Amino acid sequence: MRNEIRSLRTAHGLSQQQLAEAMDVSRQTINSIEKERYTPSLPLAIALARYFGTTVEDAFHVDNSS
């Protein structure tokens, strides 16, 4: 699943650690989401989208190419 979390985070001037603390997850979790190695749970995806003032659909993109 592709996502816009890195671009949203950097546009808001946040480090991975700052975002992790705001979401109550580890920095490694944020890093894994940004590198698309980990798909967040629905509650975390919603929390991330709300934090950045966007929708889950705009923050995360399902890749249907396979």
Indicate residue ranges for each PLM-predicted region.
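Residues in the helix-turn-helix
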Residues: 18, 29, 58
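Recognition helix of helix-turn-helix/homeodomain-like DNA-binding domains
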Residues: 25-38
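Short, conserved catalytic or interaction motifs in soluble domains
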Residues: 35, 54, 64
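Short basic helix-loop element that most often maps to the first helix and adjoining turn
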Residues: 3-22
